[in-house]
Amino acid sequence: MTLAEEFRSRNFSIYGQWTGVLCIILCIALGIANIFSFAVLRIIFSVLCLYAMSGLILIFIEVPFLLRICPTSSKFDAFIRRFTTNWMRAAMYAIMSVVQWLSLLPGSGASSLIVAAVFLLIASIFYALAGLKSQEFVGSKTLGGQGLVQMIV
């Protein structure tokens, strides 16, 4: 399946996965941009956006090919493999979005981390729609889904 065929399939998990890739880029970029701030709360939320929750964890969840080529522990692999259903991914993205929405707390002030919160929420909605429509989770072959992983093994 080509990328265009994947988008025409109307499977919301594909939309969620590609929105997740956009979230990876946004979380890493905005996490780095907001870490250079004088507001302590904003620094904490930018670290959460960059390292602890969003950016680096999402890379391994949304690009399964990386689990094959990067040396990771078995505990980390087991943690990542928990997010194989649409509902688990929707819940994960919703939690990450709520954490970034909390960056609006009065001590932090408004920042560009809101963009990450919005896109994490959109990805959560896509995965929830896939779950509501009882669509199977389908990983994009471009990102290392079924086709690419089989070629490497």
From Swiss-Prot:
Its main location: Golgi. It is a multi-pass membrane protein. It is found in: Golgi apparatus membrane. The keyword Transmembrane applies. SMART domains: Cg6151-P (SM01077). GO terms for cellular component: Golgi membrane. This is Golgi apparatus membrane protein tvp18. Belongs to the TVP18 family. GO terms for biological process: vesicle-mediated transport. The chain crosses the membrane at residues 21-41, 43-63, 90-110, 112-132. Glycans are attached at N11. InterPro entries: TVP18/Ca-channel_flower (IPR019365). It comes from Neosartorya fischeri (strain ATCC 1020 / DSM 3700 / CBS 544.65 / FGSC A1164 / JCM 1740 / NRRL 181 / WB 181) (Aspergillus fischerianus). The keyword Isomerase does not apply. Keywords: Glycoprotein, Golgi apparatus, Membrane, Transmembrane, Transmembrane helix. Golgi membrane protein involved in vesicular trafficking. The lineage of its organism: Eukaryota, Fungi, Dikarya, Ascomycota, Pezizomycotina.
